Amino acid sequence: MLINFTKMHGLGNDFMVVDNLAGDITFNAKKITNLANRAFGIGFDQLLVVETSNIRGVDFRYVIYNSNGSEVEQCGNGARCFARFVNYKNLTHSNPITVKTRSNIISLHLNDDNTVCVDMGKPSFNPADIPLLVPQQSEYYQIEGFDLGAISIGNPHCVMLVKDVNTIDVNTIALKIQQSELLPNQANIGFMQILNTHEINLRVYERGSEETLACGSGACAAVAYGVEQGLLKKNVVVHLSGGDALIEYTQGGHIFLSGPAQFVFEGQVEI
């Protein structure tokens, strides 16, 4: 079957985006991993699929697959690309655009400068929502010998405070943490260096995709944790390898992610 696709990225976190409103395209893990291969396929961190919603007031179903073929709950950078895609393809003229992910409903607002602001919902520090198998909620948890904050942004995140993100062995540490029995669904692992109360450096090892140039939900998780710990103010610039994301979070409220979403190319591929 020959399908149309669009290649996009948000701060270097790259995506293959597909319109499946007709419901005639079926993906499986083998197809996805083949398409994600950067040497023999399209190459991407995540596959984003636009599907119809059966929920009143919700414009689309936003389906996300990691490059290993696993379906995941949330992707903030992908949400920005999703918004620009459905607008560019004239699939909707709504603004904001409301979409249903695997875990929750989020709102996407297109700005005049082609950036997108995503209402990522309310972060949860409840271990059951992550899930994290611990007896009670705490400011931090010791997992595989590391002190970590744990947060759900609709998907699971752990955050480690570090002095310098450039000297951390991200892959080795993240893989060790992900193997913990305390994290039955694993987690995205963020390494946060606080520069001041409005600015951080961040690297994120994404579950199912390894380290990426940017992770929107990871940026939200890091800022939410920093605000809750009194280390950050409500407006924070997050410096990622692929560029800067802007996060706004008031303790106990919703968290907002703003940043660019870029088109790279379009094409057709046999699946």
Curated annotation (Swiss-Prot):
Give the reaction(s) catalysed: (2S,6S)-2,6-diaminopimelate = meso-2,6-diaminopimelate
**Which pathway does this polypeptide act in?**
Amino-acid biosynthesis; L-lysine biosynthesis via DAP pathway; DL-2,6-diaminopimelate from LL-2,6-diaminopimelate: step 1/1
Question: According to the UniProt entry, where is the signal peptide?
Answer: none
Q: What is its EC number?
A: 5.1.1.7
Give residues annotated as binding substrate: 13, 46, 66, 76-77, 155, 188, 206-207, 216-217
> Which Cys pairs are S-S linked?
none
Q: Where in the cell is it found?
A: Cytoplasm
- Is Cytoplasm set as a keyword in this record? yes
User: Which residues are listed under the site Could be important to modulate the pK values of the two catalytic cysteine residues?
Assistant: 157, 206
Site (Important for dimerization) found at 265
- Tree of life domain: Bacteria
One GO BP annotation of this record = lysine biosynthetic process via diaminopimelate
Q: Which InterPro entries match?
A: DAP_epimerase_AS (IPR018510), DAP_epimerase_DapF (IPR001653)
Q: Return the GO cellular component terms, semicolon-separated.
A: cytosol
Q: What class of enzyme is it?
A: isomerase
- Catalytic center at which residues? 75, 215
NCBIfam families this protein is in?
Answer: DapF
State whether it acts alone or in a complex, and with which partners, per the record.
Homodimer.
Q: What does this protein do?
A: Catalyzes the stereoinversion of LL-2,6-diaminopimelate (L,L-DAP) to meso-diaminopimelate (meso-DAP), a precursor of L-lysine and an essential component of the bacterial peptidoglycan.
Family designation = Belongs to the diaminopimelate epimerase family.
Q: Which HAMAP family match?
A: DAP_epimerase (MF_00197)
From the Swiss-Prot or TrEMBL record, give the protein name. Answer: Diaminopimelate epimerase
Could you tell me which species this protein originates from?
Answer: Vesicomyosocius okutanii subsp. Calyptogena okutanii (strain HA)
